[in-house]
Structure formats: C-alpha cells, structure tokens
Amino acid sequence: MSPLRIALAQINSTVGDLEGNARRIAEFAERAHAAGAHLMVTPELALCGYPPEDLLLRPDFYRACARSLDALAARTANIAVVVGHPEQYRGDYFNAASLLRDGKVVATYRKHRLPNYEVFDEQRYFSAGYQPCVIEVQGVRCGINICADVWEPGAADAAMQAGAELLLALNASPYHMTKQATRYEVLRERIQATGLPVLYANLVGGQDELVFDGASFAMDREGRLTHQLPQFSEALAIVEYAGGELRAGAVAPSRTLEAEVYEALVLGVRDYLGKNGFPGAIIGLSGGIDSALTL
C-alpha cells in the first residue's frame, strides 16, 4: 500500500483577518497537493488567528467564520484539510477543528481541555467538547486533538480507544525559552500512554504580546523525532505514514539560545507593526540595556 502523505502547515495567521487567513490556508493546500499530500493539517484556530479574545463574544463573528469555512472547503476540494476554527453549535461555542473534503465540511472535533491560566482564558469563551473524532484518510484512521488536549491524559486516550492509528495535534503554543524541550517531553508521555505516533502542527508569528515559534514536528510511536520544522518562519513539511510507522524525514537544525531569543524578538516586533498596519516606529533610546537590545 502506498504511504499516507500528510502535510504539516506551519502558518502565520492574523487575528480577525478571515479572508487573508483563508487565502493563506488555501495557498498552503495548493502547495501540499502539488507535493503529493493526501491531507493537510493547520494549527489551532488558523482560520481566525489566535488568540481571538473578545471577538469570540460576537455572534456575527461566528457566522463569518462559518461562511469562511464553507468557502475554504470549496477552494480546497482537491485535498483533505483539517483546519482549526471557532464554532457555534447547538447554542454553545467551541474551539474546533474540522475535516474539509470534496468541497464540504465532513467532520468536526471540539477541544476537550480549555486552558485558563496565564495568557489563556478559553473557559471565558468556549464550552468543552467531550467526544473523540477519528477520520479516515487513505485507509488510515487519524485522531484529532487540539493543543491542551495533549498536555494532559484523556483526549488522546479517547482517540486511541476510538480506533485511531495516529494522532493529529493542532496547536497555538506560545514561545518561551526551553519550550520545545517541554513539548517533546509532554508528547512522549502521550505516545507512551497511547502507542500513537503524533503530528504536531504549531502556529507561527507574533500576535500582540505573544510570539508563536512554530517548530512543528512529528514523532513515531517510540517517541523518536522524525520531522522538525524550523522556528519563527512559515513552513510546510510532508510526513509519510506506512505500515504503522512514520518514515524519517527532514529535521531542522536547532539554534543557540541567544539566536533563538533574538529571532523571537524580531518576529514579535515585525508582526506587531505589520499586523497593526503601522507605517514605522519611533525608537526612544535611554542608554540602558533595553535600548541596546532594541538597536
């Protein structure tokens, strides 16, 4: 049997720019299709950007997201896509991920674990889902989790019990120093508990005070890293799954800590200016260490 080819789409979304985000997802889907992928996975809430905050208190925003999702499904009919988006369903609101296939929305997963600490306040906006979602692509059963779902036991186990052979994790995981090592540790715990290989698609870009570093990756059922996308830039990688195993692929080189922090600062400032439409910036130099770092 030919391998299942899954594209990890490391996308830089802008909060509230539904048209621009959908266009970017469609562009990545075209690239993934051209590379022979059967399925593409986006980051968490890629359609609306993360964190959308009080936009999620507006019913018209959910309606606009639903229209954008339907239009995106029509634009990506030549490849299956799992896309993160907010959803209004039966009077409740969810952090969701849907499978788009053949021009339609055919399945939806609703995030189980809603973080409510530090920069996260998802319980303010969303209800928690409770059902697993397992989709079949090229004969392979893929479970879906969203970000915090893989940081605790429960949701990944439910996907495994529902028959998943591998796990697709959509994420909007902000950067801090040593964060990637923590992600590896957490995902290896889920892999050890479930026996499922994991494909981890993370958001990249600056949004207000947050920086998302991307660094998406794939791990096999032994917890070995098979693919690693770069930090702080958009990227697309094709992961092959055959015979119950992930095939080894490209692993981006790691940076020194100093280079990593520098790239995070550059990306955060660049996107803060660009996404807010500022024409430039005035830099006030006091002579302290903050001024030296800015220069």
Locate the predicted segments by residue:
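Enzyme catalytic cores with a strong preference for nitrogen-chemistry domains
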Residues: 1-284, 289-295
